[in-house]
């Protein structure tokens, strides 16, 4: 069986995010789908999938993915919660976003996610 080294996984994740930045959302989705096969228990893939959906402007799909799949797999991911809150804000559903962002802002395991959530709460 083929194995993927951690540095190769990081490289593929970066390539997928570059594809997102270049509006190549289908290419990014394909890369992330393959990466998920090799790293099914790594939250960074779920975060990247969420970012890809949001970057494509599909905030509703991003929230549905986070709620229906990503947070079930990674319930303690403050970054997923912060991005969910951001997507809800973009859909003008700030009332729903506030508790999610407050929870993410309390994270001590992920200072970057906590900071992002705090900044979104101030906006």
What are these regions (language model features)?
Residues 40, 74-75, 109:
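Short coil turns that delineate tetratricopeptide repeat
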Residues 89-111:
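TPR/TPR-like (Sel1-like) alpha-helical repeat modules
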Residues 10, 44, 78-79, 112-116:
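Start-of-helix register in tetratricopeptide repeats
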């Amino acid at each position: 069986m083929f194995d993927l080294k951690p540095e190769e996984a990081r490289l593929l994740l970066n390539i997928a995010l570059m594809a997102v930045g270049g509006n190549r959302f289908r290419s990014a989705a394909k890369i992330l789908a393959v990466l998920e096969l090799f790293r099914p228990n790594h939250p960074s893939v779920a975060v990247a999938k969420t970012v890809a959906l949001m970057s494509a402007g599909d905030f509703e799909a991003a929230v549905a993915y986070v709620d229906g799949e990503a947070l079930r797999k990674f319930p303690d991911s403050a970054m997923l919660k912060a991005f969910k809150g951001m997507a809800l804000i973009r859909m003008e559903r700030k009332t729903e976003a506030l508790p999610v962002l407050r929870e993410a802002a309390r994270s001590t395991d992920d200072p970057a996610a906590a900071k992002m959530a705090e900044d979104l709460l101030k906006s």
